[in-house]
Every structure is written in structure tokens, then in C-alpha cells.
Curated annotation (Swiss-Prot):
Principal location listed in the UniProt entry: cytoplasm
Residue ranges occupied by any Protein kinase domain in the UniProt entry: 20-299
Organism of origin: Cochliobolus heterostrophus
One of the GO BP terms on file: stress-activated MAPK cascade
InterPro entries in the record: Kinase-like_dom_sf (IPR011009), MAP_kinase (IPR050117), MAP_kinase_CS (IPR003527), MAPK_p38-like (IPR008352), MAPK_Sty1/Hog1 (IPR038783), Prot_kinase_dom (IPR000719), Protein_kinase_ATP_BS (IPR017441), Ser/Thr_kinase_AS (IPR008271)
Protein name: Mitogen-activated protein kinase HOG1
Amino acid sequence: MAEFVRAQIFGTTFEITSRYTDLQPVGMGAFGLVCSAKDQLTNQAVAVKKIMKPFSTPVLSKRTYRELKLLKHLRHENIISLSDIFISPLEDIYFVTELLGTDLHRLLTSRPLEKQFIQYFLYQILRGLKYVHSAGVVHRDLKPSNILVNENCDLKICDFGLARIQDPQMTGYVSTRYYRAPEIMLTWQKYDVEVDIWSAGCIFAEMLEGKPLFPGKDHVNQFSIITELLGTPPDDVIQTICSENTLRFVQSLPKRERQPLANKFKNAEPDAVDLLENMLVFDPRKRVRAEQALAHPYLAPYHDPTDEPVADEKFDWSFNDADLPVDTWKIMMYSEILDYHNVDAAVPEQENNGS
């Protein structure tokens, strides 16, 4: 039986196994507090994420289960990887992952990025997205703060708590506004992997300029800023809006012409602007895919089609439509954690049945 120790971090109790020491707060991730720690077993620095009250509601339970399943399934150099997971005696869940020194948000607010770093970071983002999308997963919340970077400029995408299946009828309020694709913001009829490409395009633009490309104060202002640069959406795109209120709003706006991005990004080389033009397209059907973007001349210094893997198999989303009580999610979660640790998942159920 693992020995647990307690520590107070920002008024929050961290109850972790004695394997992890020297806890220091790093920040808030999606739905949890993250600390750095030292792994006594490997002597490596790790990130420990506490999921707050994962069994308080069915929605939270399902969200935590989804993140756990995704972290277990997604294995790629540019995706954060799970190194340990446990449930504390207080029934909080802790994900342990590798620790990277900083994130893209902190880098972008500290200094301008040189061209080779912009290229290498964008390449790694798209390499990760190619893999994620091939697994049938859409991240949905890609932004600089959940793109982690270490001192070797290795980049890893994290925070898959909001990730969803590729679903023709996706709806909902997700990503941080500045990086949110118009089809999410305006409740388009459907959205898919292309929303991540839009977000990656916004991040690319921010790396080039040193500031957010579309810093909207609210949804209306956000859409207005986008149309100032990219023009009014084409009619066939507008017709896919399923909310009547949104449709009326878009149709009421003055017609605007798309501005050449070369005018906006005067210091960027033509190849960079061309790739950005292909990423920031209103019509998701015409937006470049990750695999195509990787082959763009701008990324030629890093592109290697033999080293840009896809997932071995699609992620199993069968649980995602399930409307289950907390206790059922809890049993499923325990089963996944035991499976991760290669323990026979039937044991606790038999014990429960016998008690």
C-alpha cells in the first residue's frame, strides 16, 4: 500500500504518494492545480496535477474520465505523456506527467521569437495535431498557455480535458476567445479538426507579431476584428450557421474585403504569410489540414514525412454519449487506473461485491 503525505499548496491540500517530494505550485490547468515535484524513483522533475473533486458531479466525473482515457491513449513526442496516476485517500485524482520548464504564453510575453524558433515551434504543434487528429480527437482549446516548451525547445501540447471526438454535430462553448475558430464562436452547424488549425494559425500569427492577432473583448467584438482582416465570410459559409440570432447578426454586418496578410505581417517572409493564409480561412472545408501544412515550404527545414507518425488506432469514444451516475464513472475510473498499473481490474469489484 502506497504511503501518502499531505502538503498545503495555495490553500489546497495535495495528498500524494511519498514517491513525490519538493512540491512547488506551477499554475492552474484545466480543472485542476498543477505543481512541480521531484520523482524519487526516477530522479526526474515532474508535473503533478490535482483534479479537484472529480466525483462531485457526473459532468466532472465524465470530464476527468475523458482526460484520463486521452492521456493513456495519446502517445507522441509532441503530446504531454502520463507517467503516473493515483487516487488519494480523500478521493482526489492526481495525474503525473513530464515537466517542461515553460509554456508558449510565457515565452511570447517575455521576448520576440527568432525565425528558427517560430518555425520549429509551429512544426511541432502541427506534428502533434497530425497525430491527434488521426486518432479521431479534436483538442478544441489550443492556446499558447497549454503548449509546453523545455530548454531544448522541445514542445508538447497539454490540457486535453476539453478534447472531443470528431463529431459532425459538435456544439458548445470551449476555447479561449482569442484562439477560437469562427465556427465554434458562431455556433456553426458542425465543427471538426479544422478548429485546431485555426487556433494554431492564431498562435503562429502571435509568434510572428509578438501579440494576439484577434484580441476580442467579447464574441461580437471578436468576430468584428476577424472580419476586419479576413473580410466577410462567404455566403455558403454563412448559410451553415444554425442559430437564427447569429445568422441575423452576421448578415447585418457591413460587407468587408479580405486584407492581404502581407500588409499586416510586413516583416514576415512570403512563405510564412502564405502558410498563415491557408490556416486562417473562414471556410473550415478549405482550411489546410495538419498533414498538408507540415509539407508547406515554410516548414521545409524540419519536415520529414517518415518521422511524422499517425495514431495506431482511433480513440474509442463510445463512453462519451453515456449519461451515467457518479458511482459508475468512479468504478470505470478505478478500472482505468488499475489497468494503467497493470493490475487485474476485477479484484476491487469482487471485493466490493463481497462486502
